[in-house]
């Protein structure tokens, strides 16, 4: 039988990252998992609040509404305002989604028609871009430096493409680990206002700073032209699939109508449990432990690499937070060739930089390592394998 797929289904891109996941490889060491180690999930807190809810609030298992649990939305607004003093977010502006990617998909349904242009930083997180591409968006990337997206390039593309919005990850960015400077944020906001597009601010890593907190958000600087995205995947657990959008109030009703037509309602038990975890006095201690562990892991990885890998072969940007190390190969070594050989011959997996580009072009000599999930022994063995793989390229 011949199946006639919709244009939207045909627009789906095969994610280049899929070739490097290889979860079944028995002795593979993974530097490609962007989630905390399982022992850092707040399991005791989750268990306690779930037991309490099931025992004392059985009505939580009934059909809920579509915007998201009210207690969760209030907890999210309170926490966002505490972390980012100028945000001024209210629970009524928040629409809870199925993880951060669910928020991106909702934005695509609300704003993108086939042929519209969406801008993003490049490199960036590709699975969000897949949501926009599925809706028929044309993708274009704005290059970055250590301070964030380049304003002159954004200005040029804004004039040329008339974008619907500009997608950014301002804090401890995936994949580069960079944090956009306050000056660069103000410049981006000014361009967005002048050209009449809005900024989609994806901020799942804000709380993962190693030392100093990140600068004020785009939302606090330019609430009139910013839609914020958030997620609990990095601070509680990815498996609970809780994300959210902060929308102008006049858009909330339309967003809820769209969600209702897609999934009717949300998993009320998990929403309420997440709210209770966020409100719990121990949650801040959990975040502090997560920060300390990620900082330690980052230092361990960079220390191992410094000891074993010559700077003529590989260099990297040391992040101030998050879970990603952005590296650059030298000597003309292709990141794709290196990643494939390292995976197949040395059984160590990571992503080449091209995976993080809007149209899978460029970043030929870049690669991303993560330091969030391995044991110390796995990290040490993984660096040994990376060094050996690099040496094999130098000898060719």
For the regions a language model picked out, list residue spans one by one.
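Conserved C-terminal alpha-helix-loop-beta "cap" of PLP-dependent enzymes
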Residues: 252, 256, 327-368, 381
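Conserved glycine-rich beta-strand-loop-beta hairpin in the small C-terminal domain of fold type I
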Residues: 291-302, 314-328
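N-terminal small-domain helix-loop-helix segment of the aminotransferase-like
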Residues: 8-99, 106, 279-280, 349, ...
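Conserved core segment of the aminotransferase class I/II
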Residues: 227-295
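Conserved core of the PLP fold type I
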Residues: 59-196, 206-227, 294, 377, ...
């Amino acid at each position: 039988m011949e199946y006639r797929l919709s244009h939207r289904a045909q627009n789906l891109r095969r994610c280049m990252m899929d070739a490097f996941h290889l979860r079944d490889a028995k002795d593979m060491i993974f530097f490609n998992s962007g989630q905390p180690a399982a022992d850092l999930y707040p399991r005791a807190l989750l268990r306690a609040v779930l037991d309490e809810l099931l025992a004392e609030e059985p009505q939580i298992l009934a059909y809920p509404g579509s915007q998201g649990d009210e207690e969760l939305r209030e907890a999210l607004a309170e926490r966002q305002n505490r972390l980012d003093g100028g945000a001024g977010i209210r629970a009524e502006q928040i629409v809870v989604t199925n993880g951060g990617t669910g928020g991106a998909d909702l934005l695509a349904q609300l704003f993108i028609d086939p042929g519209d242009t969406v801008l993003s930083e490049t490199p960036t997180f590709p699975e969000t871009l897949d949501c926009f591409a599925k809706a028929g968006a044309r993708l274009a990337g704005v290059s970055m430096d250590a301070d964030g997206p380049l304003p002159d390039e954004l200005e040029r593309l804004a004039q040329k493409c008339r974008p619907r919005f500009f997608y950014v990850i301002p804090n401890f960015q995936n994949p580069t680990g960079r944090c956009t400077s306050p000056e660069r944020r103000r410049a981006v906001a000014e361009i967005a206002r002048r050209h009449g597009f809005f900024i989609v601010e994806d901020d799942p890593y804000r709380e993962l700073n190693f030392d100093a907190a990140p600068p004020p958000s785009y939302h606090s600087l330019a609430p009139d032209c910013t839609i914020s995205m958030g997620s609990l995947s990095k601070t509680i657990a990815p498996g609970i699939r809780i994300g959210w959008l902060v929308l102008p109030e006049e858009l909330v009703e339309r967003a809820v109508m769209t969600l209702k037509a897609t999934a009717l309602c949300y998993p009320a038990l998990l929403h309420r449990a997440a709210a209770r975890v966020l409100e719990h006095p121990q949650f801040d201690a959990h975040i502090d432990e997560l920060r300390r562990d990620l900082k330690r892991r980052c230092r361990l990885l960079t220390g191992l690499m410094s000891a074993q890998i010559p700077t003529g072969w590989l260099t990297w940007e040391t992040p101030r937070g998050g879970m990603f190390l952005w590296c650059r190969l030298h000597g003309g070594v292709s990141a794709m060739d290196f990643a494939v050989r390292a995976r197949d011959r040395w059984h160590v997996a990571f992503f080449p930089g091209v995976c993080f580009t809007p149209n899978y072009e460029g970043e030929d000599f870049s690669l991303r390592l993560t330091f969030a999930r391995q044991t110390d022994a796995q990290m040490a063995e993984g660096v040994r394998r990376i060094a050996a793989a690099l040496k094999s390229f130098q000898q060719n």
